[in-house]
Design a protein with these regions (language model features):
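Short S/T/G/P-rich N-terminal loop/turn motif that feeds into the first structured element of a domain
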Residues: 1-87
């Protein structure tokens, strides 16, 4: 299992924080997420994902149509996505 740190920008931080889409998408895979926001009131947010089977599975998952729909609903700007793997 892997732990990932992911950063990206969103259109509306409050909408992103309130959305159930993360749990709906990642929960069935056994992946949990802790959310973070930039205290400088920017649109940058971050997550720590635990229980990720492996990076390849995670990357394939977030490139799926279902993930694209969830990201769109959450206002995620996919072009800003940065993923770090625990060393």
């Amino acid at each position: 299992m892997a732990t990932l740190l992911v950063f990206h920008e969103v259109d509306d931080v409050e909408n992103w924080l309130a959305s159930p889409k993360r749990e709906e998408f990642f929960g069935p895979m056994g992946i949990t997420a802790r959310t973070f926001r930039d205290p400088g009131n920017s649109n940058r947010v971050g997550l720590i994902f635990d229980g990720v089977p492996d990076l390849e599975t995670f990357e394939q998952g977030i490139q799926s149509d279902e993930a694209a729909e969830a990201m769109k609903a959450d206002g995620v700007r996919p072009q800003t996505l940065v993923t770090l793997v625990e060393a």
